[in-house]
């Protein structure tokens, strides 16, 4: 199973926030996920991002790939 760390969209129309989720790469964007490891809210004045770095490091160590957007948000 190829795992990927990517964003899943939540929120209302024109007011999104995103969960940072570990999921199977074959699932759809908002499909099932294995674990939620954080969230990102781009709609507030100061964009807030919360990530559980311990779990992020774990998933990277077992071979999960990060999407380009998650790399940019987390600064890795």
Curated annotation (Swiss-Prot):
One BP annotation, GO? translation
- Where does the sequence pass through the membrane? none
Q: One GO molecular-function annotation for this sequence?
A: structural constituent of ribosome
Do the record's keywords include Ribonucleoprotein? yes
* Keyword terms of this UniProt record: Ribonucleoprotein, Ribosomal protein
Pfam families, from UniProt? Ribosomal_S16 (PF00886)
Answer whether the UniProt record assigns the keyword Ribonucleoprotein to this protein: yes
**Cellular component terms (Gene Ontology):** cytoplasm; small ribosomal subunit
Q: What family does this chain come from, according to its entry? A: Belongs to the bacterial ribosomal protein bS16 family.
Q: What is this protein called?
A: Small ribosomal subunit protein bS16
